[in-house]
Amino acid sequence: MFKPFYLLALLGSLLACPVAHAQIFQRELGDFDLKLGTTPTRSMAQGLVKPSAVGSFHGGLDLSHDSGFYFGQWSPSAGISPGKDLEIDTYAGFKQPFDQTLGYEVGLIRYSYPEVTTPASQELFGGLTLLGSRFGIAFSNDPDKQNSTLFADLSGNQPFGVGISLKYTTHQLNTPVSVDGGYVGSFTDWSLKLSRPFMGIDLDLIYSDSNLGGSSCSAYSGHNSQCDGLVTLKAERAFY
């Protein structure tokens, strides 16, 4: 498993590479394509399936082969900022186009937390790419629950330059949680994200909610930052 300092060393060694994007460095190694940066390079394997709270220091690498196989690691938090634990998401998969407009992708992600006792979890995902947009499904086995997710990333069609992504997840708890008036054994949550770059800044407007409310929110442990409806505006700018 790659350590964060090893990722940073690799990143430093590639600073002289041609810039493929403001936050991604890319280099060809024979039949392989290597990418490093502070922006996820695969939306299905990083960020879209199971987004995590991103810390001030984050980044990763992605190695893909002409055959369609790929492997990578993404760390949404390097554990440097106060209150942020080190997280390393390791993934592998296969991606292949049927033609110029349609393709498919399958893969597996492992979420691990080396510096804490939180058990690792796995996620199996698959989806279709149609005219640049992605539609998929994912199944994961967190230590306390099972999750089934439907997602869509409509980046292939951006009205007014705005990217749109949606996610809907059903969570089945391994052990029902006691709340006022009964128990919660399962719940659902969802989110809608609008994204647009503006003067070098990546802007995200996110609406999230769940089917829980009131005292039942004590049982919530889903993807969103809170149980009730929430609107979040996020702005991010690369340092290089």
Language model segments and positions:
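Cleavable N-terminal export/targeting peptides
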Residues: M1-D31, F239-Y240
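Short glycine/proline- and aromatic-enriched beta-strand/turn motifs that initiate or cap beta-hairpins
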Residues: H21-A78
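Repeated loop/turn-to-beta-strand initiation elements of outer-membrane beta-barrel proteins
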Residues: F32-L34, S67-Q73, Q100-V106, G132-I137, ...
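Outer-membrane beta-barrel pore domains and translocons
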Residues: G37-T41, W74-A78, K95, I109-Y113, ...
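Solvent-exposed loop/turn segments connecting transmembrane beta-strands
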Residues: Q46-G55, A78-E87, Y111-S121, F139-L150, ...
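Residue-level signature of outer-membrane beta-barrel architecture
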Residues: L61-H65, F94-Q96, L128-L130, I137, ...
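Detector for outer-membrane/organellar transmembrane beta-barrel domains
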Residues: P119-G185
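Outer-membrane beta-barrel "beta-signal"
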Residues: L131, L192-G200, S225-Y240
